[in-house]
Amino acid sequence: MRILTLNCHSWQEEKQIEKIKYLAKIIHQNNYDIIALQEVSQSINSKVLFDNIKEDNFMFILMKELERLGETRFKFLWEFAHIGYDKYEEGISILTKHHIKAKESFYVSKSKDQNYWKTRKIIKCKIVYNNKPISVYSCHLGWWDDKEEDFKFQANKLLEHVKEDETCILMGDFNNDAFLSNEGYDYIIDKNIKDIYSLAKSKDNGVTIIGKIDSWEGNNMRLDLILSNKNLKVEYCKVIFNGIRGEIISDHFGVEAKIEF
């Protein structure tokens, strides 16, 4: 099973449509089964097309581009988390080729006010792959030392939805650097959660942030992770869209993995 996670930084990028087209091309070429995206936005004032999806929804435009490339197997889920940059409904999304058996979304932040930019939501779906049920989560969590919305609270809320009798794959921007000891990364790993990167036979340096971006100063960091509650057989886990493996299309790099089921 091939999987990908990316914080899209959507509608904050120059040449955004070109970057959506490039993302669609790579998804098509690499034949991913599941993609988890974060910072998937649509304009507050744009026209509603169906359900909660508006005409400039990043995921909707990505889907249309995939269809243009002849890829018609994907289904997507999108959930509005909070207002971003005063003009966007920012959310999280999952894209998959496989039948979605169940879906849900839930808050992990203390706040449930969608006008507050620190409000955090998770989207989850259940699929079947090679006759095996798998639960997939797209995650965007807060910072370790945030006094209003601390990471511990959010991680605990997330893990309440991770069931021992399910194979769970948690993908996304965890906003906690895996290179730092005794902070958010160690906290969640100590809850019997496995890092796919650590399990992988083949891997690179794992860096998904270089230099300064929103709220982060100048260090190389591994914020974007693929985690599981099970010891899975992982062929590789590598960074993509970093200028070395694929063009840069966001202020985060993506992470892809191949897992054997």
Residues of each region from the PLM?
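Active-site regions of metal-assisted phosphoester/phosphodiester hydrolases
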Residues: 1-34, 68, 73-261
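Short, flexible/disordered intra-domain loops and linkers
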Residues: 13-14, 42-57, 183
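Short, conserved active-site loops that position catalytic residues or coordinate cofactors/metal ions
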Residues: 30-33, 37-46
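A basic- and aromatic-enriched beta-loop-alpha substructure that forms the phosphate/nucleotide-
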Residues: 42, 52-55, 59, 83-94
